[in-house]
Amino acid sequence: TAEIEALGSYVSSTYPPVTTTPLAYVPQAIGISLARLLGLNTVCLLYFGRFCNLLFFVAMLYWSMKRIPFGKEVLFGVAVLPMTLHLAASFSYDVMILACMFLLTAVCLDLAYEKAQVRVRDIVLLAVLAAVAGPCKMVYAPMLGLCLLIPMQKFGKVRNWFISAFAVGIAWGMAMYLVNSQVIATYAAATEADS
């Protein structure tokens, strides 16, 4: 970087920017669209987008707190941390990730410790949460390990457990690939060229 600064010129990268799923911006887009329909000014567009992001976060937090069998205080405590609140009332796509991870945690704990049986809609919900949050930040992938807390007996048959685990895993993997395939291909090609 010292060399670049000394030359005083800009350098362009051949690598594409890391992308994220457009779903992460839906709450903000709804707020902006609503403000535009009302004919409001630019500042109101900004605040409506942020407010809708906050409303989405609060709704998902409420759903998570209703679903989690224990630890409601801990979940709420994490949700009202200053940085979490700052993100919740911003345009950041981290709100979608946090909300999905809160709900994923709540659903996994509910299925592991409260519910007598795992239903198909529970697996679909876990797969959707994994697919939406997965491409945003790969660092949250270990959170899918919470699914392993759910006892096999609650699936009825071992075969159902394997199908469910495969469905959640493939939803996460396909979402990661579809959203980030261009970035992965570019970096893989660069690595091969460097070898």
PLM features per residue range, with description:
Residues 1-48:
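Interfacial juxtamembrane loops and adjacent helix segments
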Residues 40-43, 62-82:
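Transmembrane-helix signature of polytopic, membrane-embedded enzymes
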Residues 90-97:
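Short acidic/glycine- and proline-prone juxtamembrane loop motifs at membrane-interface regions
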Residues 145-195:
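Membrane-lumen/periplasm interface segments of specific transmembrane helices
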Residues 86, 122-138, 143-149:
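Membrane-interface alpha helices of multi-pass inner-membrane proteins
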Residues 68, 104-122:
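Membrane-interface transmembrane helices that cradle and orient dolichyl/undecaprenyl
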